[in-house]
Swiss-Prot record:
This is Putative pyruvate, phosphate dikinase regulatory protein. The lineage of its organism: Bacteria, Pseudomonadati, Pseudomonadota, Alphaproteobacteria, Hyphomicrobiales. ADP binds at G153, I154, S155, R156, T157, S158, K159, T160. Keywords: Kinase, Nucleotide-binding, Serine/threonine-protein kinase, Transferase. It comes from Mesorhizobium japonicum (strain LMG 29417 / CECT 9101 / MAFF 303099) (Mesorhizobium loti (strain MAFF 303099)). The keyword rRNA-binding does not apply. Bifunctional serine/threonine kinase and phosphorylase involved in the regulation of the pyruvate, phosphate dikinase (PPDK) by catalyzing its phosphorylation/dephosphorylation. The keyword Lyase does not apply.
Amino acid sequence: MNKPQSFFHLHLISDATGETLLAAGRAASAQYKDARAIEHIYPLIRTEKQVAKVFEDIEEEPGIILYTVVDQKLARGIDERCATMGLPCVSVLEPVLTVFQSYLGTPAGRRVGAQHVLDAEYFRRIDALNFTMDHDDGQLPANMDDADVVLIGISRTSKTPTSIYLANRGIKTANIPIVLGVPVPESLVSASKPLIVGLIATAERISHVRQNRILGNSSSYVPTDYVDRAAINEELAYARQICTRHGWPMIDVSRRSIEETAAAIVALRGKNR
């Protein structure tokens, strides 16, 4: 008999695009078929203020922390915060750099994002990442016409990780939560440039992910209908109604990886051009 799949939070902190971490995290989590990582990606983290904000999010949804930060002061700060919170924390590149240093007889240059060629494509991706982080979870809704893609959906439909994945490919992506009974911003309805896509999933899948979120955040009050499948079905019906009314395509993410969802969105962009 197969074990039911469980979920855990995987926090990826990078001072560059986060692709190295994403690859390492997925390679490791793929070894655990009964546990699925809920990925939280924090790219371009280069100041203590940014680190503090990241750990505010981690405190709400604790889990495993992987990081690639070459600034040693910031790295020590991350290690200290993890130790204080009792959370597992790994500097992914540090063991590799140690081996290189031992063999080559010289310390690493500690250059941020040194693995990336500083060409036009790289700067396009950085610009997209900055835009995406500034427009996460409904922030700055007046700027929707500056986006290439806008993802909408109820809570726990993978809007943020999908947005960051697309941004890593140079696609400026905003995401807006759909809340039952609350109209979407008028700036979204009137936007003419972006591809607007609704992300949906089964009530069972969303309930499962939300329950795991609650388990990791027992200190906060959570309404009972947050995980109730009947209530979630109402939220989903409202989201579908909005998308149908405005002619926005929908993608069911229930059985899709982030990469598969992103690929479907890129395909939709190609058709709409």
